[in-house]
Amino acid sequence: YDALGRLSSQTETAVDNKYLRKDYTYNGGNVSSIKYTSQSGVLTTENYNYANGHLVETKLNNQTSIFKLTKENDMGLPTEVRSGALSRTYGYDSYGFPTSRKIQKTGVTTFLQNMEYVFDPVKRNLTYRKDINVSQEEKFSYDNLNRLTSYKGLMATYDAKGNILTKGDVSGTFAYNTSGKPYAISSSSVANGIMSSATQVISYTSFKRPNAITQDGNVASFTYNGNQQRVKMQVAKGGSRLLTRYYLGDCYEIDETPSGNKEKLYLAGENYYDASAVLVKDHTNSWKLYYIGRDYLGSI
């Protein structure tokens, strides 16, 4: 920490000598930069610019702009954002629910992403969405307990405990008759071929996280830190390692495979799940910047 008690550096160390260090600088009480360093050396530096105390721009090494807020509405919600050569526009209704999300490259008339949404402002449920690029739309309805009852013209039904009995996209029913386990499926009349017949064996840690998952000779094993956060995953088949993945700092991943290694640093966001850009280094040892398009839930 610095003399004012502010975080000045943070190092997260995983297994196998992998680590991620973040060094912070400040200006006017706001974080002005974060430098990322790993076992590979210095990765990059994020620089932040503010207006009236609000973040308005993020740059890489004080050069490449990967996030720039250009417009917001009266509720303080972003309506226009620039990410490099990409323009992102967001629409909202009078309650602040999203109505549209678009991504367009500068100088190009077509959209990389063009989504529309409608929400029930009282129950806050999504009732309609459309992907204009592929001309696909979905309508949703819910019961008085906010459970999904229809989607894409299909129906879902529930028992008194809230268990799903039928789903329109699956031919068959589900039963929950195991004594002492009212929410565990005891049987299903789903047709053969819809559900996998492969046996999957899962073991757990003392803090109820998966320790290993085995299926068809494939084994995925997991390692956690003292905060019960996953820091390593290893996938193997027949004793041969297929993939080792390390997770660090909520923003850095390392993939090691027999064919080569890859590093990914997620940027312009709080963590993996809301970052709008990712810096990737593959086996050629060169870094490339990619931008991420997400829906309103954060899914890519």
Predicted regions located by residue number:
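Short glycine/acidic-enriched loop and turn motifs that connect beta-strands
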Residues: 15, 39, 106, 133-134, ...
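Short, small/polar residue-rich loop motifs at catalytic or cofactor-binding pockets
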Residues: 18-20, 41-44, 62-66, 84-86, ...
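Short, ordered secondary-structure scaffold segments
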Residues: 49-50, 58-59, 64-82, 87-102, ...
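A surface-exposed, glycine/aromatic-enriched loop/edge motif typical of exported proteins
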Residues: 155-166, 171, 250-254, 297
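Acidic glycine-/aspartate-rich tracts in secreted/extracellular proteins
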Residues: 170, 236-239
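Transmembrane beta-barrel strand/turn architecture of Gram-negative outer membrane proteins
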Residues: 221-235
